[in-house]
Amino acid sequence: MIQAQTMLKVADNSGAKEIMCVRVLGGSKRKWGNIGDIIVASVKSATPGGVVKKGEVVKAVVVRSAKGLRRADGSYIKFDENAAVLIKDDKQPRGTRIFGPVARELRDKDFNKILSLAPEVL
């Protein structure tokens, strides 16, 4: 579960290393997000010379969640960390590489470019 103030690792090479969730998009009463949800976040740490800078407000899609996600067959998929990929307004990733595995549930939400860049889809 991702909510406001949650710190997430950035799983791409956009220049940000860590972001903090400001808002989960999808309605005024929405409190939590999970894998495949779009969030608004603030960059808390970044690498020098990257595309994004510290303090910048960005949109991101959650690709890994420690809470886990229940699949249709009854199984659960969960990860060791919370991670996100920074995206543009047209749902395309800002970076050119994705690090670590991502869940296949992103395909249902039309993040096919992220799936094609990922080294492993679980």
Curated annotation (Swiss-Prot):
PROSITE patterns linked: RIBOSOMAL_L14
Pfam family, one: Ribosomal_L14
GO MF annotation list: large ribosomal subunit rRNA binding; structural constituent of ribosome
UniProt keyword annotation of RNA-binding present: yes
Keywords: Ribonucleoprotein, Ribosomal protein, RNA-binding, rRNA-binding
Keyword Ribosomal protein part of the UniProt annotation: yes
Functional description taken from the UniProt entry: Binds to 23S rRNA. Forms part of two intersubunit bridges in the 70S ribosome.
Designated name of the protein: Large ribosomal subunit protein uL14
Native organism: Clostridium acetobutylicum (strain ATCC 824 / DSM 792 / JCM 1419 / IAM 19013 / LMG 5710 / NBRC 13948 / NRRL B-527 / VKM B-1787 / 2291 / W)
Lineage per the UniProt record: Bacteria, Bacillati, Bacillota, Clostridia, Eubacteriales
